[in-house]
Amino acid sequence: MALWGGRFQGETSALFKLFNDSLPVDYRLFEQDVVGSIAWADAIASVGIITATECSDLKQALNELLVEVQGDPAIILASGAEDIHSFVESALIAKVGDLGKKLHTGRSRNDQVATDLKLWCQSEGKALLARLQGLHAELLALAEREFDAVMPGYTHLQRAQPVTFGHWCLAYVEMTERDISRLADALTRANTCPLGSGALAGTAYKMDRHALATALNFASPTLNSLDSVSDRDHVVELCSTASISMMHLSRMAEDLIFFNSGEANFISLSDEVTSGSSLMPQKKNPDALELIRGKTGRVYGSLVGILTTMKALPLAYNKDMQEDKEGLFDVVDSWAICLDMAVLVLSGLKVNRPNALLAAQQGYANSTELADYLVSKGMPFREAHHVVGEVVVAAIAKQIPLEDFSLAELKTFAAIIEEDVYPNLTIEACLAKRDVLGGTALPQIQQAIAAKKAR
């Protein structure tokens, strides 16, 4: 039975019903709808709309329904109800008769769905926080295990300066920490209860909305009924936070795809997260990482979708807002599986230390060290930069690394170069000189890991 039939004399078009019904999407709010309805039963009992006995009967029936649906979730979609609110109310009336018709007194589907959705976001958000913390822990463990594995660092996808794999891991630890903070902030802002706002002007019954918020584990009630029923900032923020986190996951995936490639071969991925080719027997494809990278686009799409849906809506509720859930649910599902998959990828990752070290020793990644050496001898950096560029051109022509030039050859570029230049050109020296907060020197990496583990 529709919740709004009295105003209408004609039959609803079957096509319109298919177009209008949201149960195939919002069935996921079932538990939140029941929990909110239990709290609402207490609220209307507190102002005398129902008796204590009626309240107890309603709550018992709602809890029975909760158990029944948990045992057979297919009941919901088989009902043919318009939405999850209609399903719960119809099932309640089937259990307790006309008493079930009293539950919606003073309540609108507008504040009801806003409450359901915030409850769902709080629950799923906390689960996502746990997943982010799991990723953080896995990255930190990998950083500790491979803190001294030397590899090339890149700019413009060209070898730039040597770093360590531990330093690379710590970069994503920092990103993940920001994601954790961002999600926690979003959940704090969303921790307000819209229930009691009615359709748009507030409920007509003078109930204690602070008590109602407390009953539903919200920090406080919302303060403006118009805003309460039309606010979807929590959906936007959750999608935005997911998009930023997915961007970080996608960048990490791209790095690892390259590191795993035959052209780099710095790492190997476990068989658990790779697949083969139907034609080429030798292939071992990084499909888990590619799917993380690919799913990032659909998460972005949902963020743009909800922003576009909301951008021109007048206050208060509009049916457009029914479109808030499908994208949100997909965002949360995609983000969750990508976080789980990232942990699985990292847990089985092996670093090919010889190949990574060899790559770091090539590509003239020690050029900056030669420039710094010239600066230490009194040459202005800009001049030193130019001189070293000339040395690199000559080295490329001879197909040798910088350290293979004889001292006499180096002096043709700068007479101030002495024998003590050679220790400065080693990989070890390149790393050791970056002994500053945030740098790639091994002591800095160890200190950073220890500091993060101590939190």
Curated annotation (Swiss-Prot):
One annotated GO molecular function: argininosuccinate lyase activity
Keyword terms: Amino-acid biosynthesis, Arginine biosynthesis, Cytoplasm, Lyase
Compartmental location: Cytoplasm
PROSITE patterns: FUMARATE_LYASES
InterPro entries, A to Z: Arg_succ_lyase_C, Argininosuccinate_lyase, Fumarase/histidase_N, Fumarate_lyase_CS, Fumarate_lyase_fam, Fumarate_lyase_N, L-Aspartase-like
Top-level lineage group: Bacteria
Catalytic activity: 2-(N(omega)-L-arginino)succinate = fumarate + L-arginine
Pathway assigned in UniProt: Amino-acid biosynthesis; L-arginine biosynthesis; L-arginine from L-ornithine and carbamoyl phosphate: step 3/3
GO annotation terms (biological process): arginine biosynthetic process via ornithine; L-arginine biosynthetic process
A Pfam family per the record: ASL_C2
Major localization class: cytoplasm
Principal EC category: lyase
EC number: 4.3.2.1
GO annotations of cellular component type: cytosol
NCBIfam families: argH (TIGR00838), PRK12308.1 (NF008964)
Record-stated family: Belongs to the lyase 1 family. Argininosuccinate lyase subfamily.
PANTHER family, per the entry: ARGININOSUCCINATE LYASE (PTHR43814:SF1)
Protein's name in the database: Argininosuccinate lyase
Gene assigned in the entry: argH
